[in-house]
A protein has these predicted regions:
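Short alpha-helical segments that sit at the start of domains
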Residues: 1-21
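Residues within the helices of the helix-turn-helix
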Residues: 23, 34, 65
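Short helix-capping/hinge SLiMs at alpha-helix to coil transitions
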Residues: 25-28, 57
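Short acidic, hydrophobic short linear motifs in intrinsically disordered regions
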Residues: 30-39
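Short amphipathic alpha-helical interaction segments
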Residues: 42-55
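A short, conserved structural fragment
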Residues: 55-65
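Minor-groove-contacting beta-hairpin "wing" of winged helix-turn-helix DNA-binding domains
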Residues: 65-72
Length: 84
């Protein structure tokens, strides 16, 4: 699991926008992708792509248009806080 965590942390930390999306969902909770875009000041199409990439890695999930961190995503958010 440590290798997986390091790999996922590299994926998130390698892109400031991904890092910001994780932080916002962690601090503000579940929200629509357009709201994530507004809060992070990242263009909506970019946010949608970021969320899709993160969903492929089971870091976020979507239900009825509302996105939130999964258990794995919450662990990554905690690790980001430690490393931050």
């Amino acid at each position: 699991m440590a290798d997986d965590m390091d790999s996922i942390m590299g994926f998130i930390m390698g892109n400031k926008q991904r890092e910001r999306v994780v932080q916002i969902l962690g601090s503000k909770g579940k929200m629509e992708s357009d709201k994530v875009a507004k809060v992070t000041h990242i263009p909506a199409p970019s946010v949608k792509k970021i969320l899709a990439e993160m969903a492929e890695r089971d870091l976020v999930s979507e239900e009825n248009g509302i996105w939130g961190l999964t258990v794995a995503g919450a662990e990554i958010e905690k690790e980001l806080k430690k490393r931050g």
